[in-house]
Amino acid sequence: MKDKRKGAGGRKSPVLYIVMLSVWSLLCAAIWYYFVPAFITPPFAAGTGGNLALRIFAVVLLVLNALFISYFWLNGVKDFLYVMWYTFSRRKLEAKYRKVLETDVRSVSDKVLMLYCTCNDFDGESLRRSMRQTYAHAETVILDDSSQPEYKEKVDAFARETGVRVVRRADRKGFKAGNINHFLQSEEVRRSDYGYVVILDSDEIIPPDFIVSCLRYFYAYENVGIVQANHVATRNRNFFMKLFHIGVNSHWPTYQTMKHNYGFSSMLGHGAMIRRECYEQAGGFPDLVAEDLCLSIEMR
């Protein structure tokens, strides 16, 4: 298949953030207009009995209060405008994905590694369902960092049943990031011809067309390094989870769409597909707790 891919996104518009900062600045001006006179002449000055230290302490608290309110207003304005902007521009934004949907990847044969990361939390049924991909050139590998024998036995039993490869290491250096790097940066894998990597968490279930859908993005746009799917909460066992998942499920398409079109999108740690050359040029996952965000920054 001839590669005719072009760059995605182009230069992103700053309009949303100009509006956001303008609204926030007006709110800050209002609150500081109210607080500044209190800094100069505190309304409680008469009750301090001329104690200068007490007055200074009170003014410091007022300043901190104003700063905290200003900061939380910034987050509130951001979330409010994200929702409103998405609501009124949704059709226009979704039209940009038409090119992706029309991209034909039926003749693509790139090798895709599906890396299932687990550490004392193996869920065989979730992995089994995730492995039912319509894409024929995918290989699943279990990266097992488990220390408890019962979970190791579950992994080994699953591997015997399905023929899936299991990779373990001597220590847990770097935790999840180190686990992935240990495998992908091994001499054997570096000599192989894989083109993409899918990162799976232990209880995650991806749909059968996940790889095919992600490949459309990579073949539609040559500068896509990570395709991050939205997460949907499906295992809601009590009232709180059933109520909370409504907000979570609506958050991802709204928040991620706005960040993608007007800001900086980041990997969410799993449910994502990564282009090999981008992973290698970034030097792998940084050995930090927020390895997904750090890798996104490195790739950026």
Predicted regions and their residues:
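A conserved hydrophobic helix/loop-capping motif in glycosyltransferases and polysaccharide synthases
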Residues: 112-120, 133, 217
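Acidic donor-binding loop at a coil-to-helix junction in glycosyltransferase catalytic cores
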Residues: 289-295
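Cell-envelope/extracellular polymer assembly enzymes that use nucleotide-activated donors
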Residues: 110-113, 139, 294
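Short, acidic, metal-binding catalytic loop of nucleotide-sugar glycosyltransferases
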Residues: 128-137
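Long helical/loop segments within the catalytic core of UDP-sugar-dependent glycosyltransferases
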Residues: 159-160, 168-196, 208-289, 300
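A conserved acidic beta->alpha catalytic loop
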Residues: 136, 144-154, 170-173
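N-terminal membrane-anchoring/stem segments of glycan-assembly enzymes
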Residues: 1-106
